[in-house]
From Swiss-Prot:
Hydrophobic repeat HR-A/B as annotated region, ranges: 187-232
Similarity comment: Belongs to the HSF family. Class B subfamily.
Motif (Nuclear export signal) on chain: 338-343
Pfam family, one: HSF_DNA-bind
GO cellular component, one term: cytoplasm
UniProt-recorded name of the protein: Heat stress transcription factor B-4
PANTHER family: HEAT SHOCK TRANSCRIPTION FACTOR, HEAT STRESS TRANSCRIPTION FACTOR B-4
Any single biological process term in GO: asymmetric cell division
Organism field: Arabidopsis thaliana (Mouse-ear cress)
Domain notes: The hydrophobic-rich region (HR-A/B) corresponds to the oligomerization domain.
Amino acid sequence: MAMMVENSYGGYGGGGGERIQLMVEGQGKAVPAPFLTKTYQLVDDPATDHVVSWGDDDTTFVVWRPPEFARDLLPNYFKHNNFSSFVRQLNTYGFRKIVPDRWEFANEFFKRGEKHLLCEIHRRKTSQMIPQQHSPFMSHHHAPPQIPFSGGSFFPLPPPRVTTPEEDHYWCDDSPPSRPRVIPQQIDTAAQVTALSEDNERLRRSNTVLMSELAHMKKLYNDIIYFVQNHVKPVAPSNNSSYLSSFLQKQQQQQPPTLDYYNTATVNATNLNALNSSPPTSQSSITVLEDDHTNHHDQSNMRKTKLFGVSLPSSKKRSHHFSDQTSKTRLVLDQSDLALNLMTASTR
C-alpha cells in the first residue's frame, strides 16, 4: 500500500514551491523528502567539489563558492537560483551552521555514505502553519520512524516541531551566531583607541604641571619687581670724571711753565714773528737766514727772543716748513748768543 501526499508551499525569497512525497509501504516506512535527496546528490557529486563538497569528517557539507553555487548548480536541481532561499530551506529541515566565517552546514542524519538516514530528517512546522490544538490526528506518543495512521480517509503529515524564537533567530542565513564575531581589525582599532586615550591623559597631566609652574614663575617675577620698586634706592650717577678733570686743570694752572728744547711741533710764520719781537734791553740775537732756490743768503736779521723772561736758544735741527716749497729758513747763532740772561720773575 502506497500513498502520496502533495503539499505545495511558497518558497522563501521567491524560490518556488516544493512537492513533498511521502510513501508508506508495509508498516509505514517513509521516503526522504525530494529536497533532502537532491541536496545529498548535489553535495555527493565529485565533479562539483570545488563549489560544494563534504566536510572534513564527512558529517557536514561546505558551500565554497555561493555565487557559482546559486548560478550554476541550484537551477539544475531546484526551480530557483536563490542561495538565501536554499539556506532557509536547510534551516527548516534542522540544519545548523557550524562556523561563522564560511557556509558549512550539519545535521545529525545527513552524513556521507549514509543516505538511508535522510528519512529521519523532518521539516519543521511553525505554530502558525499547523496549530497544535487544531490537529486531531497528532499522536502524543510519536516515534520518528513511525507515521501515525488512523482508519480515516486522510493520511496526516508528521507532527509539527515548534521552534523557539531563539532558534529562529539563530538559523537565519544572514544573521550571526549567538556569540558575537570578533574581527581582528576591531581589536586593533580598540587597542589604538586605548593607547591614544592614555597618551591624551598623559599630555593633559603634563600640561597641568607646566601651567602651574608658569603661574609660580609669574608670581615670583611680580614679587621681584615689587621689591625692587619699593625697597631699593636708586644710585646717583658718579661725578669722579668731572672731579678728576677739574683737579687736573687746577694742577696745570699751578705748575710753572716749562720749555721743551726738543719740541718738534711746527710753528707757523705768524707765531715765529711774535716770538722774535723783543724789548730793546735784550742782548741776545737770532739770525734768520732764508735760502731760495738759488742758494744765496739775501738777508739775515739779528733778533732777540725771550719767553717769560728766558732767552730761547736755537738749534740747527729746528726747522720750519712754509708753503713755499722752493725756500727754506735756517737759524744761525753767534757765540755771543749762547749766553743766558737771567731775569727776576715778576710776582703775580
